[in-house]
Amino acid sequence: MAGMSRGRGRNQFTFNVDALGFGRGDSLPTTTHTPSPLFPPMQFQPVPLHTGEEVEYMLALKQELRASSKNLPFHIRAARTKRDVSRYSDKYQTGEPKNNTIEWSPDWSRLPKELCIKVRKPQKTITGTKQQLKQRPKVAASKEDILQKLETLEKEEVHSEEEEDEGKKKKQNDDEEEEPEVEEDYDEEELEDETDYIASYFDNGEDFGGDSDDNMDEAVY
Amino acid sequence: MTAQEVRLCGLLLQEHFGDVVENVGTHLIRNGVLTLRALAHETKLALDLVKKSLCVLVQHGMCTFGPGRRGPAGPVEYHINCEHILHMLRYPRYIYTAKSLYGDTGELIVEEILQRGQMTMSSTVKTVADRLTHNMPEGQSMDYNEVVSAFSRLVETHFLQRCPPMASAESSGTGSAETPPAVTQPSNPESHPDCYKLPYISLSGHGKRRRSSEDGEADQRAAKKAKTDSSECGDEGIHWQVNFERFHLHFRDQAIISAVSCKLDQTSGEIVRTMLRMSEVTTSANAAFTQALSANEIFRALPSNYNIARPILDQYLTLLVDDPMEFVGKAGDSGGGMFVVNLHRALANLARATLESVVQERFGSRSARIFRLLLRKRHLEQKQVEDFAMIPAKEAKEMLYTLLSENLVQLQEIPKTPDHAPSRTFYLYAVNQLPTARLLLQHCYKTVGNLIERRLYETKENKRLLEKSQRIEAILASLQATGAEATQLTEVEEMITAPERQQLESLRHHINKLDSGENQVDETIFLLESYINSTQASR
């Protein structure tokens, strides 16, 4: 009850004032307006680092490890995404890592099967065998219908269209592997004609007689 | 995992393995266990990149995989091992220890295995022999047998161990009811009985010297040779990894011996070293104290160059037992006295000394006096602190409150009355060693993270200058190889101007300081981690 009376003993606190560390008349420390500084000044200087042969050897080891780990195959860099325009320098920068290859061969028996990245061989042989595999049943099918020549001719036309479709699908599926092959074709074509003349403007007349081979109805003049 | 540990792991992964692995690793740490698809979705990376990163992490033992929550039929879940990533900070120390114990050969063996994660014995031997031959003078080459003997010694003293085998290979013979899972949990390496058994391999030959002029051809020939050679050795599928626990026991022993040598004298340090060496094989990793050794055994096992008489040895042992640090304890009287080394208590004392020294260096010796007082006397009121520490009241108050704001000292209220009136409550200050040690450990992780970031910042700021100096060094090296004149060399050297040279020099100095700081903080981290682990093991 002594502390609850408002009138008497108004300036009494409920605890021992001396324990606060300052008297009643002293000024309070200034209020802070900003957060404390990021690098507050230190009261005591830090002790200098150890020195000695052991320390320097470990320092050299650390720096060597750091430098050599950048050259190991474990240092993974993402393949650069294709920019919008193909550039001349792309032909000379084939050292870039591809995302779907792994540069070292771990012991696959110690890793789960889903992590296995099969390194794909160059695409030419695989597409060649695929095309051969798919051609053989179609060639066998066409051999069975030799009796009707018109139908075989029509089927050959259909087969070539289907092969083109399969070729397009393969191109869509295996973008990266086919593009270097396709680019190589373009490069070869460009290298063959080193002149300034655009190849498509020049018509060397080879296609003149060949177009009319299929339709023998019209007479040749 | 705490935020500081996650940040430090991310920085270490980025330094050694690049941004992609850092991205994958950080997501795995934050999310606990993840499947491959979930991880690819979270990190928004290509699936192949995620697969490659996981291969790298598993190869280095930082990630383990196991059957998921849906059992063996469900997708595989990956779980990251943060301590392994933090061990990367300590690689130079492991390599230096191997060098001091087993020479250059041992050093290179441990370095190769640390950098590659796991290796077979034959490939390690070949690579190390080639590297040693490269550094030897012309005409000499390193014989494989020497490297094999160094490897065997490392395995015999348990510094290297076999990687635990995958159980899926052995379970293929079971019945159809349990289909062999695509993957199983790898067991603890120590539980495998052949953990430290050396395989029999037929490997003989010399290290090959690689000539710098025919680098390309030699690489191709070496690659082809590697393919044919690997089929000859008989240790397929037996991979070796570094046994970090054994290195940590060695570091702990070193810390105890150096503490005893500093506190007492060199001879006491030697006696404790002898005791620890004798109980290496008989003491398990988490034991609180070594096996009891009699004074007679210690006397016989002392190194021969220490000619201590028997009574003097007894006096030293009595001194060690009576020392307040309690490194050595007396366990009995038979055989001239049975003595043990108190490992856990030694670690606790070393951690306490570290805490006291940190307070002393940051807040001054008077604050350290208050801190030590509270450590010993447990709970004290403010008035008692002032009296026992013999510090004037105002300063003592200020120091106590500074320590309190840094969380190094805790405040405990004990009310006398149910209404917790401040004038009728005891306020007691106390220091708890274990939580304070944990707090300091987090500060250490943050420190190392800051040091690494500052080093990356310094390197990035001066990237142009560093690249220029690297190019000039390459030009100089190629000129010297082709035998250029001195004038040409000086011309090339002058391409770097004097102020640039100064800038480079100061940059090198800063980076050396930061790296050295990282190594030193790592020593504190090791001490605090060992102490915290020892308290957890004893519970």
Swiss-Prot record, chain B:
Residues 167-179 have a biased composition (Low complexity). GO terms for molecular function: single-stranded DNA binding. It is found in: Nucleus. The keyword Zinc does not apply. It comes from the Eukaryota. The keyword Transcription applies. This is DNA-directed RNA polymerase III subunit RPC3. It comes from Danio rerio. The gene is polr3c.
